[in-house]
Amino acid sequence: MSKEELIEFEGTVVELLPNATFRVKLENDHEIIAHTAGKMRKNRIRVLTGDKVMVEMTPYDLTKGRITYRFK
């Protein structure tokens, strides 16, 4: 899949789930399940409840996403 097809949203982490997975509430009040991107895992960037994050999603499945950035 090319990068142009991805949709990006900002959201807030609501709940921590097992296996580096998170429940994220998006700005449009939808809740999705998201996991951290590989570069975030590699650089050991911690994501905690209440953090504001950038989530990218595929247009084919709008219930799952990937956390690509944690805002400071």
UniProtKB/Swiss-Prot annotation:
Residues 1-72 form the S1-like domain. Keywords: Cytoplasm, Initiation factor, Protein biosynthesis, RNA-binding, rRNA-binding. It holds the Pfam family eIF-1a. HAMAP family: IF_1. Belongs to the IF-1 family. Component of the 30S ribosomal translation pre-initiation complex which assembles on the 30S ribosome in the order IF-2 and IF-3, IF-1 and N-formylmethionyl-tRNA(fMet); mRNA recruitment can occur at any time during PIC assembly. This is Translation initiation factor IF-1. The lineage of its organism: Bacteria, Pseudomonadati, Pseudomonadota, Alphaproteobacteria, Hyphomonadales.
